Amino acid sequence: MMPDLFDDGDPSTEVADTVRRIAIAGFHALWEGRTPTLNELGGGDGGALEEAVAHLQARGRIEVTADGHVAAVHGLSHRTTQHRIDHLGGRVNTWCALDAIGIPAALGIDARARTACPTCGGELVVTLVAGQPESLTGAVLWYPETAGAWTHLVDQFCSGANLFCSLAHLHERVGAGTDSGTVMTIREVAELGREAWADVGGRP
């Protein structure tokens, strides 16, 4: 299961609501190519906003610029990464390959998820039609796992949630049986994405 925004914390109801508002509204803004300010997303309570941002930052679930703009949240990133989504409205970068496949699956849109095999560097393109991924022969995703809660989503989870061109290349990279995780098919990744991004609604 994808790490939840609150799986390692117990914020107050007000702070939890602010966290979700930042994540969902920030997601839609980034999808549209904007980097909104925290004040735009957080509502009127400055204390709740400050606590919500601290909660997200401490857990690696948001990136904020020095002047207070949201540069990444809920899987989307304004900065260039190795993973991106090409869709009819443009393109957007993501934190990991799982995001690149799972988000358009959740939105039910036509898109191409672009990433690269970490072992050989070969480009991998997953085509989705109305949110349904087409097959990509041999490609599998590594889903990192941990015994406890993730303390930093991007550094600990997203850095390892990669798509590989083959199971052999996955094993070369992570080491067969030496790392904790699950091998997933592209269809399984899409289904997980529908669950993880159910909160962003339908098409943006």
Residue ranges and their predicted role:
Residues 1-24:
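Short alpha-helical segments that sit at the start of domains
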Residues 26, 30-45:
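Short acidic, hydrophobic short linear motifs in intrinsically disordered regions
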Residues 42-58:
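Short amphipathic alpha-helical interaction segments
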Residues 57-68:
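A short, conserved structural fragment
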Residues 72-110:
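Short, amphipathic alpha-helical interaction segments positioned at domain boundaries
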Residues 109-112, 123-204:
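Long, low-complexity, charge-rich intrinsically disordered regions
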